[in-house]
């Protein structure tokens, strides 16, 4: 089965205070990840060693970096239009959460956009079932 790489920004609610780190999981995030694991996907959370791993249950692994190239059927989910770990080549990219307001410089393109992690998981599961 294909791999799904999850940036922490796709899993956490943004803090109202920039001085306070984002630690609260978005509602339904653990359940959405559980559905992906149950469907046979390899779910990998991208987090540095000093960042705590969110409680997502069994079957979820951790990596510090994205692979240089993602193969066909591989997914990358992020809540940040400019991810700290960069953007991969290949695979399917998904921007999760509300889209920031457009400024003078256009936002980077993503293959898909989803309102939350549950909607992104539903899209992945639907596309997998239809393949």
Residue positions per predicted region:
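Asp-based, Mg2+/Mn2+-dependent phosphohydrolase catalytic module
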Residues: 3-8, 12-18, 22, 35, ...
């Amino acid at each position: 089965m294909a791999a799904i790489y999850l940036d922490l920004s796709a899993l956490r609610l943004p803090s109202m205070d920039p001085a306070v780190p984002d630690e609260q999981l978005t509602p339904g995030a653990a359940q959405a990840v559980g559905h992906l694991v149950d469907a046979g996907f390899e779910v990998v959370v991208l987090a540095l060693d000093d960042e705590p791993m969110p409680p997502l249950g069994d079957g979820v692994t951790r990596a510090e970096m994205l692979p240089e190239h993602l193969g066909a059927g591989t997914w990358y989910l992020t809540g940040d239009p400019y991810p700290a770990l960069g953007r991969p080549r290949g695979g399917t990219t998904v921007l999760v959460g509300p889209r920031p307001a457009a400024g003078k410089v256009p936002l980077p393109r993503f293959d898909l956009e989803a309102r939350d992690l549950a909607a992104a998981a539903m899209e992945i599961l639907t596309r997998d079932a239809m393949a």
